[in-house]
């Protein structure tokens, strides 16, 4: 039997790896579009600034073809280069288009009519057509210019420093548009505005050279539609990653923005690794996770096997990105989302409510994270040289702060389906510990017992962790049955409910809330507003309210 299981594990891993061809293999050739890219061989800042504005106008033009916009984008991203001829060769690697370089000497005064070099392959009709496209801005562009300030285009630019400041200000906006061009292009632009504010604060973006939102949207749309441009940008990102600490301004900027672009489209995979495997909590030993753990192992090997370009699978439209979809490991994904919802407030802004999300295992993750927040990792504690008393003190401190007992305020439970703004809890103060703005613990989930007098025997948990929280001497009521957040899984046998109540902590500890003296005076509160009196002979009453009360 063991040989069959080993063969299954090897089969699962090889199934992910054997589909990939050799690196550098040339795909079957398809029809290619001709893309004209403009090259300026002189460092003249005036000519380059005119080319910058010309490219912006071509991208925003309402009658420009896709090939016109692709050529304008590649030219735009190549303008800071001292040797544009060599830099544009990065785009030659793309099997999607045929790049034609057109050397330009300048523009006719007062117009955007190109003055081609003798070696440029441009006809008079093409030059006239480009001039018409540059003047054909859509009515959604205000003041006849892509910039917010109407006088920016007409300003003189006779210094290299002036050109670089203006060019970097425009390019950094284009790079920010790359961040969401493949994953959330139709979402509100709140994240883009925050990044613009960040780069303005750093001095990389001058507010005077901000583009209109419509111009930014058109740039993002053009990048999204062109695989050639995205392949070119991927090479730029790889160049930026290889730079040392002594780099130029442009690649330092690209490397910074690249952190927002890397691993886009793989968020579910990395969050699953972080909150499911990274925590190393006992529910990972469930038999239901065995097959999916093998799947995650094969995906980690696939990611390493792809190499440097694995960070840009979404940007490159690589088919391998489908292998990392959470639909291939739904149970452990659901468990990880439950853990992350409790541990990380920002997780509540992540859309994890997929059709395959299992409410049963999501609740396992929620309950486990609530109970495990006060445990101590023995290996880390040994490295720090903590004594048993110090470990107990840390655990008690976390418990008190998570419950909000320091100020006599009971901590409110976390409902992952309510926006974080509606879950604000009063600040909890415990002696000289800084106040917490929000409590991520339920207040009733990890025992609820006041710390009794006398020596407490620590409870040893799975995963090499020890729980130093005091255990109640007696619990007068039975454990609450597991009530899932999803109604479709509510008909669970009682024996399974009894088992779920034991995951992440000891049994019969999650209904009482004790006061500061350790007396069980408050009624226990369960899911959906049910209260359980401390007096077993008293009938339970229905409490109207929600999690936030």
Swiss-Prot record:
Entries under Pfam families matching the protein: Paramyxo_ncap
The keyword Lipid metabolism appears for this protein: no
Molecular function GO labels: RNA binding; structural molecule activity
Main location (coarse class): virion
Record-listed Phosphoserine modification sites: 439
GO CC terms, sorted: helical viral capsid; host cell cytoplasm; ribonucleoprotein complex; viral nucleocapsid
S-S bridge residues: none
Keyword entries, A-Z: Capsid protein, Helical capsid protein, Host cytoplasm, Phosphoprotein, Ribonucleoprotein, RNA-binding, Viral nucleoprotein, Virion
InterPro entries per UniProt: Paramyx_ncap
Compositionally biased spans, kind Polar residues: 531-542
Family: Belongs to the paramyxoviruses nucleocapsid family.
Main function: Forms the helical nucleocapsid (NC) with 12.71 N subunits per helical turn and a rise of 5.3 Angstrom per N subunit, protecting the genome from nucleases. The encapsidated genomic RNA serves as template for transcription and replication; encapsidation by N is coupled to RNA synthesis. Forms the encapsidation complex with the phosphoprotein protein P. Before encapsidation, the newly synthesized free N protein, so-called N0, is chaperoned by P.
Subunit structure, interactors included: Homomultimer; forms the nucleocapsid. Binds to the viral genomic RNA. N0 interacts with the phosphoprotein (via N-terminus); this interaction allows P to chaperon N0 to avoid N polymerization before encapsidation. Interacts (via N-terminus) as N-RNA template with the phosphoprotein (via C-terminus); this interaction positions the polymerase on the template.
Domain remark from Swiss-Prot or TrEMBL: Ncore is globular and carries the regions required for self-assembly and RNA-binding. Ntail is an intrinsically disordered monomeric domain in the C-terminus.
Protein name: Nucleoprotein
Organism field: Mumps virus (strain Enders) (MuV)
Gene: N
